[in-house]
Amino acid sequence: MIVLNALSYLGIVLGFIGMTVSIASALYYISEFVEEHSRLAKAFLCRLVYFIMAVMVFLVIFDGFPFWLSAFSIFSHYIYKINFDTFPFFSFKRMRFLLACFLIVANHILWVRFFQVHEFPIKPRGLTYDFVGQRLLTSRASFSQVASFMGVCVWSVPIGIFVSFTAADNTLPTITTPSSSSPDAYSSGSSRRTSNVLRQAYKKLGIFVERSLTSLGLSDRSSERYV
């Protein structure tokens, strides 16, 4: 089955490329949406933080998740939320933003280690041992369960913060001319110039995707040549 195996490898590669392009396109669309509807995006992220906090409490009560690790995650989302006071503007020099960046990495590492070593009882929540003293059957969380938890409770708010970097031209302090009138000149825009790296990266990615589709004959512009 040489040809069939080659087709399977080709399908895997094409699927990975398609998934990558889809994720990049979704991030670009979300960033444009945040730029046009910043208030709505801020309200959604704040309510998302409250929802995740409630989910963490329910996981501790009903599924036996560790209390201190869940409390740490709730505290992390509280730190994320207090950074929304200047949304969609973020200052890379503020301690609360640097703390939020540290908590994002710490949450990811701690929860990954938790799912690697922790086993859940197959029966409904209860003791690890039954009344006779025999050990209950346990199993680790499935991939879909881990991916869903990490995507909703760990990554969703940080991704929202990441895509909001492109919501304004003066968000990222990359190449700037500081103003002497205000220490918080990152939000003024009239006193300095800012090069928005993420916006340029998204636009270049969109141009690359459009050129790739044109070369494959899948774009409307390529069909106009033969009309």
From Swiss-Prot:
One of its GO terms (cellular component) is COPII-coated ER to Golgi transport vesicle. GO terms for biological process: endoplasmic reticulum to Golgi vesicle-mediated transport. GO terms for molecular function: COPII receptor activity. It is found in: Golgi apparatus, cis-Golgi network membrane. The chain crosses the membrane at residues 10-30, 48-68, 97-117, 146-166. It comes from the Eukaryota. It is a multi-pass membrane protein. Its main location: Golgi. Keywords: Golgi apparatus, Membrane, Transmembrane, Transmembrane helix. May play a role in retention of a subset of membrane proteins in the early Golgi compartments. Belongs to the SVP26 family. This is Protein svp26. It comes from Schizosaccharomyces pombe (strain 972 / ATCC 24843). The lineage of its organism: Eukaryota, Fungi, Dikarya, Ascomycota, Taphrinomycotina. The gene is svp26.
